[in-house]
Amino acid sequence: MAKSKFERTKPHVNVGTIGHVDHGKTTLTAAITTILSSKFGGEAKAYDQIDAAPEEKARGITINTAHVEYETANRHYAHVDCPGHADYVKNMITGAAQMDGAILVCSAADGPMPQTREHILLARQVGVPYIIVFLNKCDMVDDAELLELVEMEVRELLDKYEFPGDATPIVHGSAKLALEGDKGELGEQAIMKLAEALDSYIPTPERAVDGAFLMPVEDVFSISGRGTVVTGRVERGIIKVGEEIEIVGISATQKTTCTGVEMFRKLLDQGQAGDNVGILLRGTKREDVQRGQVLCKPGSVKPHTHFTAEIYVLSKEEGGRHTPFFNNYRPQFYFRTTDVTGAVELPKDKEMVMPGDNVSITVKLINPIAMEEGLRFAIREGGRTVGAGVVAKIIE
């Protein structure tokens, strides 16, 4: 069976379901694909197809994730759903499935539970920009006042983690009824309402090519008579011949000019997001550039050494550490293409971190790295991955 061609006619957005175990994330995912596929085409996925999520590896960490896709009137969505709580933690921290927005599923019968809170906090820490709420199992609650109370609790929880509680769309429904073909307002109509909320509340994300130019340095060569060539994959934006660029990270920031872009040994006028290119730099010496730095549009990214991060520490079974670590732990932090040693400061209430935990930490690197909030990294000891993390807030 040949794979059908991906038609890029509608803008593409990445979303996912989050929320407490057994509140109905997977049932909702099945209901969305079932109802939207009948309206806009696409493939319906049954509950057990989604629940049997295949294993994937991201940054050396095994994660179970189910990927489905569906269309609404205006957009094409890629949607991730994870079977277990640990999979969510790993997924959100490694950025294996980058989300432009999340659908928080909360059971109206139970109200917000510990993982509801934890997933909202994670979404805030890893930079998921928008949350829409699906209040599920509303068919099990007869009391309208109780529904109102649960909705209020959810809005307060969103506010607490700096999401706009009052402005957040909350859709009341029952994923189970919808999946069973119920056409009522808690069934199919609720799914259609959710689709409208996705379309209107989550803005179309900026495409990588529209961002400010950035390319991590992978290798540096000296070509006699021509100068220094830096190779790598353009992460975002466009670089044109003749443009000024900065070299950021490790040492003091330097300014230079791009005098040539080549790809597969051919000269180009420009390189753009996704391209593997060699960039020729004017007047830059071979020893001025090294792996771990980035080339970027001047002023767009700054080098930093001190930041807070949300991290996941691999369990022993995943090939991680066998023992806990303590305050002032000094592993290597692998950003983009290189390792930098840093010291870890634990939160006041944490004496140690066990393999398999996720925790907020503060890090001080020995060398500056070009970074922005939301940048992902791996934590390594002697080349072996022992954790994954994401920059939450830059301190300096």
Swiss-Prot record:
Keyword check for Transcription: no
Q: Which stretches of sequence are listed as region G4?
A: 136-139
Report the EC number(s), separated by commas if there are several.
3.6.5.3
Record-linked InterPro entries:
EF-Tu_GTP-bd (IPR041709), EF-Tu_GTPase (IPR050055), EFTu-like_2 (IPR004161), EFTU_2 (IPR033720), G_TR_CS (IPR031157), P-loop_NTPase (IPR027417), Small_GTP-bd (IPR005225), T_Tr_GTP-bd_dom (IPR000795)
Question: Which amino acids does the record list as binding Mg(2+)?
Answer: 26
Q: Which UniProt keywords are given for this protein, alphabetically ordered?
A: Cytoplasm, Elongation factor, GTP-binding, Hydrolase, Magnesium, Metal-binding, Nucleotide-binding, Protein biosynthesis
Describe the reaction catalysed, as an equation.
GTP + H2O = GDP + phosphate + H(+)
The cellular location(s) given in this protein's UniProt record come to:
Cytoplasm
UniProt: GTP binding residues: 19-26, 81-85, 136-139
- Entry-linked SUPFAM superfamilies: EF-Tu/eEF-1alpha/eIF2-gamma C-terminal domain, P-loop containing nucleoside triphosphate hydrolases, Translation proteins
Q: Where is this region: G1?
A: 19-26
**What does it do?**
GTP hydrolase that promotes the GTP-dependent binding of aminoacyl-tRNA to the A-site of ribosomes during protein biosynthesis.
Similarity comment: family membership: Belongs to the TRAFAC class translation factor GTPase superfamily. Classic translation factor GTPase family. EF-Tu/EF-1A subfamily.
Protein name as it appears in the record: Elongation factor Tu
The protein's organism comes out as: Methylibium petroleiphilum (strain ATCC BAA-1232 / LMG 22953 / PM1)
Q: Which gene encodes it?
A: tuf1
